[in-house]
UniProtKB/Swiss-Prot annotation:
Coiled coil: none annotated. Residues 55-165 form the Expansin-like EG45 domain. It holds the Pfam family DPBB_1. It comes from Oryza sativa subsp. japonica (Rice). This is Expansin-B15.
Length: 264
């Protein structure tokens, strides 16, 4: 009986040990799920050390050259530009398939649209500024990497972090007492917006939904004179909300920038 019991016990121990061994396929699948990198394509446009185009389809204008964007920008294929709703979103991009690639990720912000050519040939494509494309290279090999022209890359959506920079609202030059349009820039976190609302001052003031005009510009055609100061409520693409109270003052002027005291 004792020997039979020992045999059964030994068999149980062996089975238990085998069961507890890691399964290669399960382990690989687990790590694949943890990875947030996806495959895409990249080209570059504009000057070799420039910011792509002057402003781009999001409407940021000269801000693309200046800090905090600092020329590290991208024009996105339709799948990530999202008819302008992707403006301001941040991505890490890296390349490994060229000898000049460093393999280290760099962060870019979406400021423009790439509507045709290679941007339609694959699900996700980044047409990077020359500066951003070269930033993926090994030290001293930026020109060599740019000479490749087209790359397969890996990309990852990441939160935007503009340090101490606050939300900025640039009043569109076409605005008037009855029509108000504003460019929103430097949103931390999601970076892109799904909704913008305005509250004017006065009796019965309430939040009024603005409409996306184009790119990162939102508009409200009130049909009657709006009473400033205005508060603006932003909803990010993931549903987070933030209020910039009285950020647009009385006596606002078209073309002027107004900096809030808040950010996501």
């Amino acid at each position: 009986m004792a020997s039979r019991f020992q045999l059964i016990l030994s068999t149980f121990v062996v089975i238990a040990a085998v069961t507890m061994l890691p399964r290669p396929c399960a382990s690989i699948e687990f790590h694949r799920k943890l990875s947030s990198w996806s495959n895409g394509g990249a080209t570059w446009y504009g000057a070799a050390n420039g910011a792509g185009s002057d402003g781009g389809a999001c409407g940021y204008q000269g801000a693309v050259f200046q800090a905090p964007f600092s020329s590290m920008i991208a024009a996105g294929s339709p799948s990530i530009y999202k008819s302008g709703l992707g403006c301001g979103s941040c991505y890490q991009v890296k390349c490994t398939g060229n000898s000049a690639c460093s393999g280290n990720p760099v962060t870019v912000v979406l400021t423009d649209e790439c509507p045709g050519g290679p941007c339609l040939s694959e699900p996700v494509h980044f047409d990077l500024s020359g500066t951003a494309f070269g930033a993926m290279a090994n030290p001293g090999q930026a020109d060599q990497l740019r000479a490749a022209g087209v790359l397969q890359i890996q990309y990852n959506r990441v939160p935007c972090n503009w340090g101490g920079v606050k939300l900025t609202f640039v009043v569109d030059v076409g605005s008037n007492p009855n029509y108000f349009a504003v460019l929103v820039k430097y949103e931390n976190g999601d970076g892109d917006l799904s909704g913008v609302e305005l509250m004017q001052t006065g009796a019965g003031a309430a939040w009024t939904q603005m409409q996306q005009s184009w790119g990162a510009v939102w508009k409200l055609n009130a049909g009657s004179a709006l009473q400033a100061p205005f508060s603006i409520r932003l909803t990010s693409s993931s549903g987070k909300t933030l209020v910039a109270s009285n950020v647009i003052p009385s006596g606002w002027k078209p073309g002027m920038s107004y900096i809030s005291t808040v950010n996501f």
